[in-house]
Curated annotation (Swiss-Prot):
GO molecular function, one term: rRNA (guanine-N7-)-methyltransferase activity
Localisation: Cytoplasm
Function: Specifically methylates the N7 position of guanine in position 527 of 16S rRNA.
EC number: 2.1.1.170
UniProt KW keywords: Cytoplasm, Methyltransferase, rRNA processing, S-adenosyl-L-methionine, Transferase
Species the sequence originates in: Coxiella burnetii (strain CbuG_Q212) (Coxiella burnetii (strain Q212))
GO cellular component: cytosol
Name of this protein: Ribosomal RNA small subunit methyltransferase G
Length: 204
């Protein structure tokens, strides 16, 4: 499994220390254990988790900007946890409304000493941190328009949304911000289509 992750990271053109890669794999094992009781993810095998969770999350790393990142609907921690592992200099806030998921994330952050993450259990529309984020990430949660509307109060002017999607979200992009750019994500070992919708916040 170590080699599978290493090769995938190399194919993505990223540089992640081997110690960090080992921590990522340990996190997956921890998730697998919790998943038996709490059903946090439909993907149960470590091999598939590497592709569908770790490498998929890391594929958006080159597009990450700023130091304050909000991961919305973080669930079992994707993409937030892998990105936090890979970018210890950035501050990540992972928000989810479900208690069992934030309980897992709190335990994982403590166990693996991920000191650059803050875990919040709350609906994102009600979240008021008292500051703005530079980037808001989201995977598999609502339409592009819905995500932007629910989180607009949290993103600084000039900041960006990075919204992960499967197939090209043509219908979702109709009527959204004209500044939207769609990137094709080539995730090593993943046959399914993956796209990243990047939208800049142009509010004054």
């Amino acid at each position: 499994m170590t080699e599978k992750l290493k090769q995938g990271i190399d194919q993505l053109g990223l540089k992640v220390a081997e110690t960090i890669q080992q921590s990522m794999l340990a996190f997956l094992a921890f998730l697998q254990k919790w998943n038996q009781a709490y059903n946090l993810t439909a993907i149960t095998e470590i091999k598939s988790m590497i592709t569908h969770h770790l490498l998929d999350s890391l594929s958006i790393l080159p597009y990450l900007k700023g130091d304050k990142i909000l991961d919305v609907g973080s669930g079992a921690g994707f993409p937030g946890i892998p990105l936090a592992f890979a970018c210890p200099e950035k501050k990540f806030t992972l928000i989810d409304s479900k208690a069992k998921k934030t309980a897992f994330l709190l335990q994982a952050a403590s166990r693996f000493k991920i000191t650059n993450v803050t875990i919040i259990q709350e609906r994102v529309g009600s979240y008021q941190p008292g500051f703005y984020f530079d980037t808001i990430t989201c995977r598999a949660l609502g339409s592009v328009r819905e995500i932007m509307e629910q989180t607009n109060h949290l993103l600084r002017s000039g900041g960006q949304w990075l919204i992960m999607k499967g197939t090209y979200p043509e219908k979702e992009l109709r009527g959204t911000d004209a500044s939207a750019i769609v990137h094709v994500l080539n995730v090593p070992g993943l046959k399914a289509e993956r796209h990243l919708v990047e939208v800049k916040n142009n509010k004054g």
